[in-house]
Amino acid sequence: MFFESYTEKVWGRQPKEISAAWGAQRIKGLSIRKVLIDMVKKLSRLNSSSATISQKGTETSLIERFLYPKLGPGQMWEEVANDLRAQGVNIHLRHNVKKLQFDQGTNKVISAEIWDDTSFTTQRRDYDYFISTMPISELIESFEGPVPEELPTAIQDIARKLPYRDFITVGLLLNQLQGPKGEELDDTWIYIQESDVKVGRLQIFNNWSPYLVADASKYWVGLEYFCNKGDSLWNLDDSQMIELAKREMDRLGLSRYDDCIDATVLREEKTYPAYFDSYQDFDKLSAAFNALPNLFLIGRNGMHKYNNQDHSMLSGFRAAELIAANKLDQSSKSSLWEINVEQEY
């Protein structure tokens, strides 16, 4: 299998140990026949003057063109935040939800205990609706006091035991970057199938947007490593991770060891919600959360779903639509879980 080595790097498991739901979600209805049809369509578009960014009807796995903010995806959310503030919306940054409290009569969440990282104080606030993007394993631990009967201990245990994979990015600033045969690399990202290196994927930030790199004669790349917090890879210090990344770029023939002129390391926990262990009972968990009228789970970690960024955003739109229409019943909320099961964009 072409992606076998990469899959093992990402999940730390052999593909046969992972739920088929993950593979089905990633490749959707892809087949050799559909790949060939897509190739013919692309050849036709090359000879057409009407080619646009629109790719309606294209298989999800075969999307090749997309819009990208010139300063990265965070730029879009900064603009959204500025627009909201201009409309009088308060956005509290550096605040962490620590506890959620239920009303036993309605099964609604009624208040949140919030830690303010700027003032080092705790506040309790009441809200009408709660939209969560935090990992479900952390959300379940935030419930304070008696919880609704829809969340018995067995259901809570499913949430607590949900598996995740953690993530390390090593950024290298390089004098030179090229393919193994000396060719120019125009990819935005490259999957690394080789089993003799630990890196799983390479991002070339120059190719995402030239505005992300101060000096156009240099190359910023990100080597992505998948691990679990506390394992041997996670426990390497930053200097050791940088050393590993430089050696592996050299081994792959993408740059020489001495081409690196600067480096940085970023670590992120629970980057990938995993599809094994207690995930096999996830349907019971999602049904239980659907029974809590004013609590909506969205996003990759919020739904424990390996969404792309666009599908994560769509889940937020769908939650807002349900709230605006006062559709808080289980049946209506179940529509959130139908996002990212379609075969096409």
List each language-model region with its residue ranges.
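Short, surface-exposed acidic
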Residues: 1-3, 16-18, 152-159, 254-262
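Active-site catalytic microenvironments for nucleophilic, acid-base chemistry
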Residues: 9, 83, 138, 142, ...
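Active-site/ligand-binding neighborhood in enzyme catalytic cores
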Residues: 1-102, 110, 115-118, 126
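C-terminal lid/capping helical subdomain adjacent to the catalytic/cofactor pocket in oxidative enzymes
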Residues: 266, 276-345
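General small-molecule cofactor/ligand-binding pocket signal
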Residues: 90-92, 261-264, 296
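Mid-domain catalytic core of redox enzymes
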Residues: 69, 93-239, 243-255, 281, ...
